């Protein structure tokens, strides 16, 4: 049988050769099978919520616009996308070694005596060479599989960056809203304090008040001005953070007060399975890395066995270019080669040990990712009900303080209490309004964190 007929058979045999990689088994999840959920507000099944993209989750159109802009311009996401392209090219490069390599060549030479008393000698040649490594033990196949899994892991890493960017832009936007709302409350409070100061000043002129009350009124005005300056700085910082995430420094949307209806609340079944975590991109990335480590063990094991390569070629040579392709000028060659590892001072065993240890490290990393993901979801679920309870209590407290302030002002006007009682009520009301804003912002951030932790985005 000629080499040309042997080569396709060898290629087919090598491509279907055995693999020495261990059979892959997904590690057991080192977390409970279900999350502990209260029944409050968790009644609607949400089997498809992971497929509900951020355009569905975020109701606020301004948020959607900002996220769309960030997905186009953000440098972190752009870098992650380039890494995916690099990993894809690396996989193609490694996979190419599994297939025959075919190269053509041609050359011509002219030679003669320097004295010019002999005729010029000419020589022309062409050739076609093929080479192929018979991958009987799966070394190249496993190396290719490892690169494929690395490429898939990079894709999941890019998806994780995408989800994180969506989350960060939304949180930054709501932080801007919070800073603006706190500034608005501080400015409103300053106006109220200034009105109180004017009232106390009039009472001082009529003898119904004293200098101490006037100084107290002036003191809270200056304190509130200081708070306004602080809130202005926080708003500027929030704008800077948002612009960095957007990847551009164009005009930001006008800040608005916090809207509690900016998000579509995540509805969860009472018996939420922890299996849902397996769809998170960071966990899928870790699993692909584990599969790559598994394939590397197969490549390391194959190094203990012989490697066989085939080289074949056809060529022609002639002193006359016109007769270069005559049948009489053609030649062929077929060169099989086998390399058998005999002694390498333990190099192959060390490579296998490294591959096995890295596979064990990948298992630990995979389990850690699952445990961290479980904690993120469990924390968000626990905080969810706590924040709702805190907000309800704070709203009742705010209503009580508003009544207290009204009564304190009425009593002060009739001389029944000192101005200090009014100041205490105003300070408490101001602080409670700020706290309620903080709690509403925390609830929004927690909803975003829960949505992200469950793999949404």
UniProtKB/Swiss-Prot annotation:
Lipidation residue positions, type N-palmitoyl cysteine: 18
Result for mutant: residue 273 to P: In strain: K1 / RS218
Signal peptide coordinates: 1-17
Miscellaneous comment: The cus system plays an important role in copper tolerance under anaerobic growth and, under extreme copper stress, in aerobic growth.
Family to which the UniProt record says this protein belongs: Belongs to the outer membrane factor (OMF) (TC 1.B.17) family.
Description of how the protein assembles with itself and partners: Homotrimer. Component of the cus efflux system composed of CusA, CusB, CusC and CusF.
One cellular-component annotation, GO: membrane
Protein name: Cation efflux system protein CusC
GO BP of this protein: copper ion export; copper ion transmembrane transport; detoxification of copper ion; intracellular copper ion homeostasis; protein homotrimerization; response to copper ion; response to silver ion; response to toxic substance
Annotated effect of mutating residue 232 to R: In strain: K1 / RS218
Database matches in PROSITE patterns: PROKAR_LIPOPROTEIN (PS51257)
Keyword Membrane: yes
GO molecular function: copper ion binding; copper ion transmembrane transporter activity; diacylglycerol binding; efflux transmembrane transporter activity; identical protein binding; porin activity; transmembrane transporter activity
Effect caused by changing residue 102 to F: In strain: K1 / RS218
Inducing factors: Transcriptionally regulated by CusR in response to copper and silver ions.
Keyword annotations of the record: Cell outer membrane, Ion transport, Lipoprotein, Membrane, Palmitate, Porin, Signal, Transmembrane, Transmembrane beta strand, Transport
Residues lipid-modified (S-diacylglycerol cysteine): 18
Effect of residue 33 to H: In strain: K1 / RS218
Role this protein plays: Forms pores that allow passive diffusion of cations across the outer membrane. Part of a cation efflux system that mediates resistance to copper and silver. In pathogenic strains it allows the bacteria to invade brain microvascular endothelial cells (BMEC) thus allowing it to cross the blood-brain barrier and cause neonatal meningitis.
Effect of residue 6 to I: In strain: K1 / RS218
Subcellular location(s) of the protein: Cell outer membrane
InterPro entries: OMF, OMP_efflux, RND_efflux_OM_lipoprot_NodT
Lipid bilayer topology: Multi-pass membrane protein; Lipid-anchor
Top-level taxon of the source organism: Bacteria
